[in-house]
């Protein structure tokens, strides 16, 4: 997964 790992609340965390 990429989005879940890099984007938690719509922000690159």
UniProtKB/Swiss-Prot annotation:
Record keyword Glycoprotein present: no
InterPro entries noted in UniProt: Mcrtin_ACTH_cent (IPR013531)
GO cellular component assignments: extracellular region
UniProt main location, coarse: secreted
MF annotations from Gene Ontology: hormone activity
Keywords per UniProt: Amidation, Hormone, Secreted
Valine amide: modified positions: 13
Domain of life: Eukaryota
A Pfam family hit: ACTH_domain
Subcellular location: Secreted
Family: Belongs to the POMC family.
Name of the protein in its database record: Melanotropin alpha
Species annotation: Anolis carolinensis (Green anole)
């Amino acid at each position: 997964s990429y989005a879940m790992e890099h984007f938690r609340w719509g922000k690159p965390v």
